[in-house]
Amino acid sequence: MVMRVPAEIQGELLKGVAITSSFVHASVALDNCDEKRPQLPDRGHDDNRRRHTTLYALYDWFMGWDQQWLRDLDDDLAVYSHDHGLYLPPVGSGYWTDGDLQSNVDTAWPLPDDAAGLLPAAISETADELRGVTRADIQSVLMQVPPSWPVTDEQLEGLGWWMERRAPAVAGRIEQLASS
């Protein structure tokens, strides 16, 4: 799910663990779930007609690969995405380079699932959210990458450029889902 953490709840949650206002994508910890591949399952359950729309956006924006969906068996089969280690170009490799980002920045990468049954309002909302993502939003997320991770500031800067540049085109492709 893609959401914005509001400023009203930012701050220290536990000693040494803080949350900041920003866009986030996350899955909750599910105690009773199963995994489905590759198609998004159970569109008619829970709020999946809305949730699936954000997953189409995530997949296209970050050039997803190896679709893995968790179904919450205790919550009307709500669907979540997980394991994004093979996202970003070159897809399926588990790493990216500036050259790969630059050469794929304008590449459409739609989720290959049938889009029938998505909630029209969610399509519009998701496209609007993508168009509303600012450089500051992206920076706030990328600045949370722990220094111990094997990625340089230059690589994160390149990823930020790529995200910013792709967002409007992905928004346009998400809007096109309404006619499918």
Predicted regions span which residues?
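C-terminal catalytic region of ATP-dependent kinase domains
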Residues: A78-S180
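A generic structural signal for short, non-catalytic loop/turn and secondary-structure boundary residues
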Residues: E12-L14, D74, L156
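Short alpha-helical "patches" and their helix-cap loops
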Residues: V2-R4, Q68-D76, Q176-S180
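Short amphipathic alpha-helical segments and their helix-coil junctions
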Residues: D31-L40, Q144
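General structural signal for secondary-structure boundaries
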Residues: A29-D31, G44, T134-D137
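Conserved ATP-binding subdomain of kinase catalytic cores across diverse folds
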Residues: M1-N32, L58-W65, H84, W96
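Residue-level detector of functional hotspots within protein domains
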Residues: V5, P41, D47, T53, ...
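Conserved kinase catalytic-core segment
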Residues: K36-S93
